[in-house]
Regions:
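A cross-family phosphate/adenosyl-ligand binding-site feature
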Residues: 1-173
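N-terminal entry module detector
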Residues: 143-144, 176-182
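Glycine-rich flexible loops
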Residues: 179-367
Length: 367
């Protein structure tokens, strides 16, 4: 079936002692509807919270956490820890494996299995110095993706509050880990005019990609850069490291019809291709777009005026239109919990704009 995009994937979900744990079953069923085989493992504190939840009986919930039965289930392709409590996050960071779920996690770390951790705790625990140490430790492992909680100002108390991000954000992260595109893409030609070291566009992408990496706005393989060219949109490939772009990482989007992206290139285009197409297709040749991830800008409350209402989904027509509307009055868009989009005539001007926005935020804006 067309929507079985996770077919053949085995996902372990480890849920901890947080109120959000009761929302896990619907999310697991959503993953299963896309073809994944999902197993749930709950910590002792989580088991207390979900003890009376009948919905947990209808999923692969490993109640007894029996290590002797470990071989009865398939080896995981990915582990999702959601929600992840203060206690569990710190135990992961320092290597404590005092329960079956934690043993599964540390075993997976040892064999370099992709792991996603979605933090869920109150603002005071999140600001605890132990969390900052744990985040520093976890960030050294490139196989672990850490999803920070969403932090907002309470409308009634005017105080900061934090909660786990939306399940849409978590699902999006899973898809990215498996390099699954949020849209259908069709390759028409494996080569394009930019797949050469001699290409001026490639040289510019390579040069400025390194610059974006150096100012720390395109971490790991996050972000993309694009440019309006004569016969379409040139964009970096999905999974490309912006700081280490090769000629094969340049993809040409020729057209988008019926939500299908038609492209030339050896690799698939960036997951932000629909956004890039809509923002650049009517622009003059040479106009550029950068999708970056500056954490300080992402979590600053000063940017609410140019921030999307909800977590930004790359294939959502309404949200792409929302981005277009924000850009009418602003020179950039803060995609909620999904980075930023800057448009400019030159990469130099975009870099200057990013640095200007960053410097305009005081240390008090740090979360």
């Amino acid at each position: 079936m067309k929507n079985q995009i996770l077919s053949g994937k085995v996902i372990y979900v480890v849920s901890t002692g947080c109120s959000k744990s009761v929302e896990v079953p619907p999310f697991i069923k959503k993953l299963e509807s896309k073809g994944a085989k999902v197993y749930l493992f709950a910590t002792e504190e989580c088991q207390k919270i979900i003890a009376d939840e009948e919905e947990f009986e209808n999923i692969n919930y490993r109640k007894n956490n029996n290590t002797k039965k470990r071989n009865e289930i398939e080896k995981e392709d990915l582990i999702l820890i959601a929600p992840c409590s203060f206690n569990t996050l710190n135990k992961i960071a320092v290597g404590i494996a005092d329960s079956y779920p934690l043993t599964l996690i540390h075993t997976a770390i040892g064999r370099n299995t992709p792991i996603i951790i979605s933090a869920a705790m109150n603002i005071n625990l999140w600001n605890n110095f132990n969390i900052k140490k744990s985040l520093d430790s976890i960030s050294k492992n490139k196989n672990i993706t850490m999803i920070w909680p969403e932090i907002k100002i309470d409308s009634k108390t005017k105080e900061l509050k934090s909660s786990m991000v939306s399940w849409n954000k978590i699902e999006d992260t899973i898809m990215n880990k498996f390099h699954i595109m949020p849209f259908e893409a069709t390759c028409e030609n494996e080569n394009n005019d930019f797949n050469s070291c001699k290409s001026e566009l490639y040289q510019n992408f390579n040069l400025y990609g390194k610059a974006f990496k150096e100012i720390h706005v395109c971490p790991d393989k996050a972000g993309c850069i694009a440019e309006r060219v004569e016969n379409g949109i040139a964009i970096t490939a999905t999974g490309a490291d912006v700081g280490k772009i090769s000629p094969e990482d340049i993809v040409l989007i020729k057209k988008v019809e019926d939500e299908i992206v038609y492209y030339d290139g050896k690799k698939k285009p960036s997951s932000e291709s629909l956004l890039a197409w809509n923002l650049l297709k009517d622009k003059p040749t040479g106009v550029k777009m950068v999708h970056c991830h500056c954490r300080k800008i992402t979590y600053s409350f000063k940017n609410e005026y140019c921030t999307t209402k909800d977590y930004f989904l790359s294939n959502n027509k309404d949200q792409i239109e929302e981005v277009e509307n924000i850009l009418i009055k602003n020179d950039y868009v803060n995609l909620r919990l999904h980075g930023q989009v800057f448009i400019g005539d030159t990469f130099e001007s975009i870099i200057g704009n990013i640095v200007s926005k960053y410097c305009s935020l005081s240390e008090e804006d740090d979360i």
